[in-house]
């Protein structure tokens, strides 16, 4: 984009479609438009395509294809995972039904689709909700901060894999392994199983995601964050035998009854292709984003005094830079001074109309004033070096003028 005097650095908000994904979607729109439930050959063509995509998406996270259910996106996948985990304890005749109030644990930096759904359940008196706090200063979550909140009524834990604003990776594997051991002893003591969900919207296509290593029961997949279409999927461990899935949509019984509504074959085809690209190229993507990020940080530091890079911790996403501009300047002003040449954001895209400093950044240790001086820059897998150089030049001038 720098060739036309612009740099897109907002890949955590959304990514463009990869050209190969566009190709597969286009082909599918033309040839696989039959209803996947139809018994004739056009239906079979579409349902075969969906089966192939399911395998591609499963391969991206080292899962079994049977454990993938296609959905409209990350918000739906998060809500279905949460309501399913909760249902395990509230359904009539379940052995845990004597539990008066199910207890759920989440972190204080989750995406709104998790935070707001759980907060509403709490406000309705349906659950008791605890928030594990990330460490102020680092934005990191210690496994003990989550595990120490577990009690005899806990039935569900939801912690995101990577934070969309800070880029900090959360200790999902450590929590998952601890829960696996804990669930063995809970079962012996007739206590409810604790289901574990992670929202992987921001980590797929940026770091390795392996559901077996992470030891999760549910994992949210969002296509438009890894150069795929604007749909998603939910991984449910041993879906048919072990982990409950409560459908949000009832109807014709598509997706084996777990998500009714005629399948969006072309977009599902695109999601499969996007997943396959991640399988083939993840190391290359990671290497490229890390190099661009490091170049951006060192060039910005050379050019602008008094800037700070927040949340430089290990592990973190290779593509996200939380840039704190110098004192007496606001991030809003700096972005305005870029005159539309830099596409970056002050925080999550869904909060772009808010005048308030980001609650995620404040929960992660920044003061309101520091949060108001923070720009989120997120790099893509194909961002050219020249676009990084262009962004440094424009941001430097914008800070000086501000
Ligand atoms: C961490 C995280 N979870 C969930 C979502 C929701 O995805 P969607 O808006 O596609 O439903 C997003 C999107 O910004 C996200 O960043």
Residue ranges and their predicted role:
Residues 1-402:
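Pyridoxal 5′-phosphate
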């Amino acid at each position: 984009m720098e060739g036309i005097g612009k740099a897109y650095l907002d890949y955590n908000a959304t990514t463009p479609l990869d050209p190969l994904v566009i190709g597969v979607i286009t082909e599918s729109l033309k040839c696989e438009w039959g209803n996947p439930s139809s018994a004739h050959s056009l239906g079979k063509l579409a349902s075969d395509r969906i089966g192939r995509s399911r395998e591609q998406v499963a391969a991206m996270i080292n899962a079994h294809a049977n454990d993938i259910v296609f959905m409209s996106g990350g918000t739906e996948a998060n809500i279905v995972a949460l309501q399913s985990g909760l249902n395990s304890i509230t359904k009539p005749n379940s052995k845990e039904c004597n539990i008066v109030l199910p207890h759920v644990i989440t972190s204080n930096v989750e995406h709104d689709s998790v935070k707001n759904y759980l907060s509403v359940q709490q406000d309705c008196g349906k659950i008791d909700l605890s928030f594990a706090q990330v460490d102020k200063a680092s934005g990191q979550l210690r496994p003990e901060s989550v595990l120490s909140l577990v009690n005899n009524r806990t039935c569900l834990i939801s912690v995101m894999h990577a934070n969309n604003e800070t880029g900090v990776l959360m200790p999902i594997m450590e929590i998952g392994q601890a829960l696996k051991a804990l669930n063995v002893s809970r079962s012996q003591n007739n206590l409810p199983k604790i289901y574990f969900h992670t929202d992987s919207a921001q980590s797929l296509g940026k770091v390795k995601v392996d559901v077996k290593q992470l030891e999760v029961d549910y994992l949210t997949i969002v296509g438009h964050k890894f150069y795929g279409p604007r749909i998603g999927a939910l991984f449910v461990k041993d879906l048919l035998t072990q982990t409950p899935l409560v459908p949000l949509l009832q109807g014709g019984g598509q997706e084996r009854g777990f998500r009714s509504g005629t399948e969006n074959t072309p977009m599902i085809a695109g999601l499969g292709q996007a997943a396959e690209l991640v399988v083939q190229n993840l190391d290359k993507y990671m290497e490229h984003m890390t190099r661009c990020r490091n170049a951006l940080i060192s060039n910005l530091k050379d050019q602008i005094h008094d800037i700070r890079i927040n949340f430089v911790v290990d592990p973190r996403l290779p593509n996200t830079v939380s840039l704190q501009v110098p004192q007496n300047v606001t991030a809003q002003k700096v972005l305005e001074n870029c005159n539309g040449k830099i596409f970056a954001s002050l925080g999550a895209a869904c909060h772009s109309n808010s005048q308030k400093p980001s609650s995620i950044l404040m929960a992660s240790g920044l003061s309101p004033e520091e949060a108001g001086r923070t720009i989120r820059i997120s790099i893509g897998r194909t961002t050219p070096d020249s676009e990084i150089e262009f962004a440094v030049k424009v941001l430097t001038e914008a800070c000086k003028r501000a």
